[in-house]
Amino acid sequence: MAKRSKAYLAAAEKVDRTKLYSPLAAARLAKETATTKTDATVEVAVRLGVDPRKADQMVRGTVNLPHGTGKTARVIVFAAGEKAAEAEAAGADAVGAEDLIERIQGGWLDFDAAIATPDQMAKVGRIARVLGPRGLMPNPKTGTVTTDVAKAVSDIKGGKINFRVDKQANLHFVIGKASFDEAKLVENYGAALDEILRAKPSTAKGRYVKKVTVSTNTGPGIPVDPNRTRNLLDEDA
């Protein structure tokens, strides 16, 4: 394990690991325990009571964060003709078809999200092994395979995020920056949590949301009460 910095260790001492924090208290503490001078990213990890090995227990979805992520996503679009023009007008960072695929095959991956029109998916399939493991493969379930490319670009740049359970039944997503006030962080968290709860598989048994941790990308994890799904802006009782 990498040696922790003095700043990290000092921040970790502020976290009481014997308690479960309210989302509001956790957001406040995450801001306090960011250990860099740069604007740290605030992240959430959720452990779910599902078995990702079963196809009917795969949890995935999208959510438009009401306050965005604090970062403007770099979006590419696989499209041609009129749809390519629409994507460019909407602010896509790169638009193309065969040329864009060749660029990615050459090692270029300087983007955060990829969108494709349905007619381009057969071609995009050639780079599925590059995009898939990075969570960048366009998919109809996340709204990234669509004919309405302008809306898809606008949504992603406006703060739309994707979530997908990993092999260990964990979800990871961003809810903003340490510079956000805690209420905005909590409202973003609540929007994501609502979508995760809606995505609960009918075959999942027992407790669905088992563990929640909030942290900055530079600070210690803060345990959050997984049962707090309503009145998230309330303080601890």
From Swiss-Prot:
Part of the 50S ribosomal subunit. GO terms for molecular function: rRNA binding; structural constituent of ribosome; tRNA binding. The lineage of its organism: Bacteria, Bacillati, Actinomycetota, Actinomycetes, Mycobacteriales. This is Large ribosomal subunit protein uL1. One of its GO terms (cellular component) is large ribosomal subunit. Coiled coil: none annotated. It comes from the Bacteria. Belongs to the universal ribosomal protein uL1 family. Signal peptide: none annotated.
